[in-house]
């Protein structure tokens, strides 16, 4: 019996196929059913500006550093308000159980930047659309707000907005959700209307693209010695598998790396600010610029490059031992250099 060699499989089939995301705007496949006691949007969208480090008072009672100042890496998100330009009612298809759009209502007055991504009608007949809502009110199972980002209020320097659908939840009664959606038509929603400091959020974004990469960078294959044991190359595998099957998923292969949609769960939201000048460094964020309005501080790193759209949502699977939901005390941020 020969020596048993431990050779774990390379990569995860959970993220197969490793190809470029279909859209740079992340697609949220799951929305949690949370009980907030009042109707509210279940998510928000912001732009990644950069990272800093902050001094925060540790408020976890079981931590050895409880009550002491600790240094945390934080990500800064530029969070201009979202514009609600409509909402949709969804019913269940009796044949397959899927959601089907039943009614749609647009706001009477739409911003001019929305014409860059939508063909705007000359006049919106809101009364006619509201009759459809009343027709499907009894069979509706979900209400989703149609929102548009406002990048002209951010530090990116572009005008074309991104469009998203964000469900309205927080209460089980569908009539309360519809009433809340009607009240939001033509208005803006700030991050404080959706989240509160101290809570956990899930982050969905498209990662930074790396292009076509080899097996060493993509899967961490060992580089062979440069002067022997490398008959046909030292930055490659010895074999890519047998003749049949044609493709071995356990074998590292070169290909696309990065620009994949990824979800990171249970990131703690440290702070929601209104004045971006208090968080922006003197020379601005590198490769981003200046934050002009509301911003969000999240503990840890987030996927994606600077200027990339990041979608935040209420946690889909919060931990059993969640940190305190009270607002953390942020003592100092590294952008406040003398």
UniProtKB/Swiss-Prot annotation:
PANTHER family linked to this entry: 60S RIBOSOMAL PROTEIN L3-RELATED (PTHR11363), LARGE RIBOSOMAL SUBUNIT PROTEIN UL3 (PTHR11363:SF5)
Gene it is expressed from: rpl3
Subunit and partners: Part of the 50S ribosomal subunit. Forms a cluster with proteins L14 and L24e.
Annotated protein name in UniProt: Large ribosomal subunit protein uL3
GO cellular component: cytosolic large ribosomal subunit
GO MF, any single term: structural constituent of ribosome
Recorded family membership: Belongs to the universal ribosomal protein uL3 family.
One Pfam family here: Ribosomal_L3
Residue ranges, annotated region (Disordered): 230-256, 315-338
